[in-house]
Every structure is written in structure tokens, then in C-alpha cells.
């Protein structure tokens, strides 16, 4: 669940891209964006989540369907990034001695960050990449959008990165 407004419970923003985001090259890191509140109060918030882990994994996925507290839904898709390469927080957990490599999964990462909020946010900041979103006007029965701006088809679509696949 997400909220249209920031509240004590829903305090983690899902952002659209700012105008000054460069088309190529790097911008601020995840930690700089979040710790310095550079986007705060600029009207770039699409929604507010209650859990930073959900926002982090939404950024990894690149698109999703938001369900608001009032029951409405909104489709969002990739709207740009800060240009930094993704760095695995799972590998960082192994490097820090938190888990062995064979123990790490998305579920393990999510649970550990939720159990360790301060250290968890530090861990998420290990990944400097930050993804921005845009609202998508697509019917609810369609799947999430892929790199070609088409709805994905279960058991048929494959993940690609347009930087590497034309």
C-alpha cells in the first residue's frame, strides 16, 4: 500500500525525475538524494510508501502497480536514473559477513533490512543507483511495461537492458 500524501506511516517517497537530471552521465548517488533531501518539497513525489525496502525493490524492478490506501491503483514505469551502476546489496551482505553467499535472496535482504532499520538503510545506500518513475496510462489487466514500452506477457517476455540490447 502507498499513500498520496506523506504521513507518519507513509514517509518514503517514490519520485518522478527532476528536470535537471542529465540524459547521460551521472547525477547524485542514492545516499546523496535521500540524505540531503534534494528532491523534497518539489512536487516530484508520485506516492509515499511505508517501507524503504519496497521502494528499493520497486526501483530494481523498474515498473510496478501502486495500490493506494483508498483502493485506487496507479501504474508506474521507468522514468530515468541517476546514471550510477547497480551494486548488489546481497554481495555487500556477504562481504560484511552478515550472511554466506548461498543464504542471500531478495526475501533475506528484505527481512534483514526491516529488522535492522539503521544498518539496513546504510546497506541499501551501498547501491548508488537510483531509479525515477513516470505514471503510465495502461489498463489494469495488462502486465507491467518492458523496455520497449509494451506490456510484458507471462512466460513469454524476457528481461533486457536497452543499453546492451538494441
Segments (PLM) and residue ranges:
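C-terminal soluble interaction/assembly domains
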Residues: 140-166
Amino acid at each position: 500500500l502507498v499513500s498520496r500524501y506523506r504521513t507518519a506511516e507513509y514517509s518514503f517517497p517514490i519520485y518522478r525525475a527532476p528536470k535537471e537530471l542529465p540524459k547521460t552521465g551521472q547525477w547524485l548517488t542514492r545516499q546523496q538524494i535521500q540524505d540531503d533531501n534534494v528532491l523534497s518539497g518539489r512536487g516530484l513525489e508520485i506516492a509515499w510508501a511505508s517501507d524503504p525496502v519496497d521502494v528499493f525493490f520497486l526501483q530494481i524492478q523498474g515498473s510496478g502497480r501502486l495500490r493506494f490506501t483508498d483502493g485506487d491503483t496507479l501504474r508506474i514505469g521507468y522514468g530515468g536514473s541517476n546514471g550510477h551502476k547497480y551494486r548488489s546489496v546481497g554481495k555487500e551482505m556477504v562481504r560484511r559477513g552478515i550472511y554466506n553467499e548461498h543464504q542471500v535472496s531478495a526475501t533475506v535482504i528484505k527481512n534483514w533490512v526491516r529488522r535492522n532499520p539503521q544498518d539496513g538503510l546504510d546497506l541499501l545506500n551501498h547501491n548508488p543507483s537510483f531509479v525515477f518513475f513516470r505514471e503510465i496510462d495502461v489498463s489494469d489487466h495488462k502486465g507491467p511495461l518492458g523496455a520497449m514500452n509494451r506490456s510484458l506477457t507471462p512466460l513469454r517476455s524476457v528481461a533486457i537492458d536497452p543499453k546492451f540490447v538494441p
